[in-house]
């Protein structure tokens, strides 16, 4: 049995695309992530009941990744919060909230801490203050804390692995971390060492640079983790 949960994003750009999605393609995933930021707010609202009905047997993470954090949608604070509040009516298992980009929205959603994946994405670097950011996020008491950063050299990846391990040992097993790009691929399959409890894998199109396919991720983690469970 694997320790690391595999999350597979679904990125739809039009309402009609949901009909073409086969639930069976995602059976190897532990969690399905609806990356809704490729749709307009109105289309998100229209698709939501159909999406949650279609994947009612799956655990669902809802993510609205904004342009500021590497996503595809640019919305006001008010609209960001409105979308998340509307989605919460469908009782997703988890909902991503961008902590440093949308702090006011998180403050309004604190009653949903047990569902929140508090996230921070940096597509430029591994910031020198990453540890302090992780501690600040951890102190908010959410279900998970997620960081994705861009390494410039090999030591950046090793630093992230060590920071994740240190945070897990100190504060518990609710951290999710990854170094993006080809250089960071090791971070996506090393959760059994670092304590990072989720990894993200692509079905076909990846949602982040360096993402490994679902099939390959399952094979690698089964090889690395099955004897450790």
Curated annotation (Swiss-Prot):
Top-rank lineage group of the source organism = Bacteria
Q: Which Gene3D superfamilies match?
A: Aldolase class I
What the protein does comes down to: Involved in the third step of the chorismate pathway, which leads to the biosynthesis of aromatic amino acids. Catalyzes the cis-dehydration of 3-dehydroquinate (DHQ) and introduces the first double bond of the aromatic ring to yield 3-dehydroshikimate.
Source organism per UniProt: Lactococcus lactis subsp. cremoris (strain SK11)
Protein name per UniProt: 3-dehydroquinate dehydratase
**Which annotated residues bind 3-dehydroquinate?**
33-35, 65, 188, 207, 211
Q: Which UniProt keywords apply?
A: Amino-acid biosynthesis, Aromatic amino acid biosynthesis, Lyase, Schiff base
Q: Which family does the record assign?
A: Belongs to the type-I 3-dehydroquinase family.
């Amino acid at each position: 049995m694997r320790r690391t949960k595999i999350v597979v994003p679904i990125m739809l750009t039009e309402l009609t695309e949901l009909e073409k999605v086969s639930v069976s393609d995602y059976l190897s995933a532990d969690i399905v992530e609806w990356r809704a930021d490729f749709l307009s707010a109105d289309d998100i609202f229209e698709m939501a009941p159909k999406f949650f009905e279609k994947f009612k047997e799956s655990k669902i993470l809802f993510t609205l990744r904004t342009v500021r954090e590497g996503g595809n949608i640019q919305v006001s604070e008010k609209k960001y919060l409105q979308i998340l509040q509307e989605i919460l009516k469908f009782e997703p298992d988890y909902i991503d909230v961008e902590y440093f980009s949308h702090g006011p929205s998180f403050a309004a959603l604190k009653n949903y801490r047990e569902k929140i994946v508090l996230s921070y994405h940096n597509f430029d670097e591994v910031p020198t203050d990453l540890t302090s950011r992780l501690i600040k996020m951890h102190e908010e008491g959410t279900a998970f804390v997620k960081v994705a950063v861009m390494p410039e050299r090999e030591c950046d990846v090793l630093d992230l692995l060590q920071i994740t391990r240190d945070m897990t040992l100190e504060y518990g097993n609710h951290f999710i971390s990854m170094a993006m790009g080809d250089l960071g691929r090791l971070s996506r399959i090393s959760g059994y060492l670092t304590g990072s409890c989720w990894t993200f894998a692509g079905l076909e199109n990846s949602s982040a640079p360096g993402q490994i396919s679902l099939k390959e991720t399952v094979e690698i983690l089964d090889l690395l983790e099955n004897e450790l469970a």
